[in-house]
Amino acid sequence: MADSADVFVKLPEGERIPQKIVELTGITDEQLKNEGITEAEASARFTELISGGRVLLVAHNAQFDLLFTAEMLRRHGNGGPEALKAADYLDSLTVYKDRRAYPHKLANAILAYKLEDKVQNSHRAIDDVAALFEVCKAMDAERSDLLSYVNVFGYNPKYGVSGKRIEKVAYWPQNFNKYMQAPSYTLPAKLRQRRR
């Protein structure tokens, strides 16, 4: 991890945090109002963070996060959309689905790799980033094939790809597995076989 940012983003005028989110995160409307920055400022900071060099963005269910982020960057410009397109992407959910049986939430990966004492599952972005970093390290130690998953996203064949497809990403249907897939049966291996 080269750099990080941990900021609150103010809600648009008149909007409030749903009570369920307050209960999950402990973040309140008052905190966002007093400690938050505007979405435009957050967009500019994120653009700066991912600009200038090779960038690998890692997320658990990256399709959702990338589309959400792309929309924010589009609203504010500043070169953000171009910087996001220039990055590469690793979807830890796709990797984890090749490693473990359902369910596949980040919390399940934390338990599977016995990281409960090392990370917090607080539903706060910075804690989720730290947890995801540790999960990825554990998956790499288990089998060092993470780079083969760069720009490869699995999706549930029952529902299809969620939202707009991202240009540089190869999408492939990915069923729930009952055990760790052999290297020749992982999603990247299936894509390589298809391209032959």
Language-model features, listed with the residues they occupy:
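Conserved non-catalytic scaffold segment of RNase H-like nuclease domains
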Residues: 1-83, 108-123
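Acidic active-site catalytic centers that drive phospho-/nucleotidyl reactions
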Residues: 65, 91, 128
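Buried hydrophobic packing segments
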Residues: 69, 95, 132-136
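Hydrophobic/aromatic-lined pockets within catalytic cores
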Residues: 73-74, 100, 114, 134-141
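Short alpha-helix plus adjacent loop in nuclease-associated cores
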Residues: 87-104
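Short, structured loop/turn "capping" segments at alpha-beta junctions
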Residues: 102-103, 118, 143-146
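Acidic, divalent-metal-coordinating active-site segment for phosphoryl/phosphodiester hydrolysis
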Residues: 124-138
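Acidic two-metal-ion nuclease catalytic site recognized across multiple nuclease folds
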Residues: 134-196
